[in-house]
Amino acid sequence: MDLRLVLVASPILLALGWAGFNIGRAAVGQLQLMIKRSRA
């Protein structure tokens, strides 16, 4: 692994990971709302 490649890739991977985490959390919240509505 080239150090420059790591320096370029790490912020991109962090950004993708953070976006994926936020999207996943939002999706879980929506699913929980749907489950609550279907039970009520």
From Swiss-Prot:
State the organism named in the record. Answer: Synechococcus sp. (strain WH7803)
**Where primarily located?**
membrane
Q: Where are the transmembrane segments?
A: 5-23
Asked if the keyword RNA-binding belongs to this entry, the reply reads no
The entry sums up its family as follows: Belongs to the PsbY family.
Record flagged with keyword Thylakoid: yes
Q: How does it sit in the membrane?
A: Single-pass membrane protein
Assembly and oligomerization: PSII is composed of 1 copy each of membrane proteins PsbA, PsbB, PsbC, PsbD, PsbE, PsbF, PsbH, PsbI, PsbJ, PsbK, PsbL, PsbM, PsbT, PsbX, PsbY, PsbZ, Psb30/Ycf12, peripheral proteins PsbO, CyanoQ (PsbQ), PsbU, PsbV and a large number of cofactors. It forms dimeric complexes.
Gene Ontology MF, one: manganese ion binding
Q: Where in the cell is it found?
A: Cellular thylakoid membrane
State the name under which the record lists this protein: Photosystem II reaction center protein Y
Gene Ontology process terms (BP): photosynthesis
